[in-house]
Swiss-Prot record:
Pathway: Purine metabolism; AMP biosynthesis via salvage pathway; AMP from adenine: step 1/1. Gene3D superfamilies: 3.40.50.2020. InterPro entries: Ade_phspho_trans, PRibTrfase_dom, PRTase-like, UPRTase/APRTase. CDD domains: PRTases_typeI (cd06223). The keyword Glycosyltransferase applies. GO terms for biological process: adenine salvage; AMP salvage; purine ribonucleoside salvage. This is Adenine phosphoribosyltransferase. Belongs to the purine/pyrimidine phosphoribosyltransferase family. It comes from Bordetella avium (strain 197N). One of its GO terms (molecular function) is AMP binding. It is an enzyme of class 2 (transferase). Keywords: Cytoplasm, Glycosyltransferase, Purine salvage, Transferase. Pfam families: Pribosyltran.
Amino acid sequence: MQTDYAEVVRRTIRSVPDWPVPGVTFRDITPVLQDPRTFRALVDLFVYRYMRQRLDLVAGVDARGFILGSVLAYELNLGFVPVRKKGKLPYRTVAEEYSLEYGNATVEIHTDAVRTGQRVLLVDDLIATGGTMVAAIKLLQRLGANVVEAAAIIDLPYIGGSQHIAETGTPLYTVCQFSATD
């Protein structure tokens, strides 16, 4: 069943060549979200994977990680923690800077977002360089969380992000992968 669902999701993801810049193929999840049956299939893949695990929270990475992360938190009867871009949270925060191709970026979470020992599932839509996900893992761990697994819809392993996540010791689950030639 899960293999079929994963293939349905993969086939529904739109590939947009040369966006946002020439030479890049953007993997667009909006067709998955727009079709209720495919969106349900995607959510079910994650729910079936995590429904028997002892989890306390789902953390979602800004911004598309909020979409899937909040739905999973609801379906699994867990709380949700947003990992935001710098300057978007109103309360005291802890921050982690990470490198981009041409500069740096920062993500933040509230200082009271997790308690020591809480078991957290970290969710985003896509793994490319892995920088944002690794920064989110570090933030959660700094606050004492146990990041049980990082999860995403799409992995682009040829860019190397999944390897960077593996180097943190955090397991990674993705629904599908795309190669540079897909």
